[in-house]
């Protein structure tokens, strides 16, 4: 029996916290149109994601994918690190 998996949401965002073990907080920035004025307004939503090997560091650009609930707040997992942060 070959059942096909449902499509899962994939987001790209910046790591804003990596202080937890095997967990990162990713801020995904996007925009919405203001209902009255029609201007595009930027906003960010933060997601907690599972990082099994602690690969992602602060300010890295990462890709996360929706998955089953892993804890009370984690619903995403790290797919890959797109761009490493520049350390000065």
Curated annotation (Swiss-Prot):
UniProt GO MF annotations: rRNA binding; structural constituent of ribosome
> One of this protein's GO BP terms?
translation
Q: Which UniProt keywords apply?
A: Ribonucleoprotein, Ribosomal protein, RNA-binding, rRNA-binding
Listed under GO cellular component are: cytosolic small ribosomal subunit
Pfam families documented for this protein: Ribosomal_S17
Q: Which NCBIfam families match?
A: PRK05610.1, uS17_bact
Per the similarity annotation, which family is this? Belongs to the universal ribosomal protein uS17 family.
What does the subunit comment say?
A: Part of the 30S ribosomal subunit.
What is this protein's function per UniProt?
A: One of the primary rRNA binding proteins, it binds specifically to the 5'-end of 16S ribosomal RNA.
Q: What is this protein called?
A: Small ribosomal subunit protein uS17
Quote the gene name from the UniProt entry. Answer: rpsQ
């Amino acid at each position: 029996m070959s059942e096909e998996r449902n499509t899962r949401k994939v987001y790209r965002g910046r790591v804003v916290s990596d202080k937890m073990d095997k967990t990162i907080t990713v801020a995904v920035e996007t925009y919405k149109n203001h209902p009255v004025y029609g201007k595009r307004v930027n906003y960010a939503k933060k997601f907690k994601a599972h990082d099994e090997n602690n690969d992602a560091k602060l300010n890295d650009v990462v890709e996360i994918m929706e998955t089953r609930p892993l804890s009370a707040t984690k619903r995403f997992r790290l797919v890959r690190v797109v761009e490493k942060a520049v350390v000065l």
